[in-house]
């Protein structure tokens, strides 16, 4: 949902800039352009997803959305040929376990925003494999086994963003701010 929202904002900016250039607010105008006015790109999106089918679905959804947004841009900026093909590889979307993946090998150092929706599993609902992943992320810290599974994403995000200007937002339950896990997380 983030990509179409960003492109919608960008289209508004393109339309406003075009209106300022031509003096024709709200009217389509012919301005000869050498370069595409589009700056928000699928190449700026990165991701790690454990489910291969979900990766394929995400790529297909992004390709469809890109085409839809380029058509809307074409309505504003009629003189530029927004060619959708060939499809981009979307190689920045990685299939893998986010807790076992070195994020510095997937995400660029100058990443602006890190947004995620990690799985919520209380300490008593984790499989042996998930518990082992959690303990590995927390380097076996005392009481780490009592942390909600999504807490491991917070730790990975904190380590990845340390010393960087990257802002982070993760969807999670309020349980990560309660009980024994508070000491290890916060």
Segment roles from a protein language model:
Residues 1-186:
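SAM-dependent methyltransferase catalytic region
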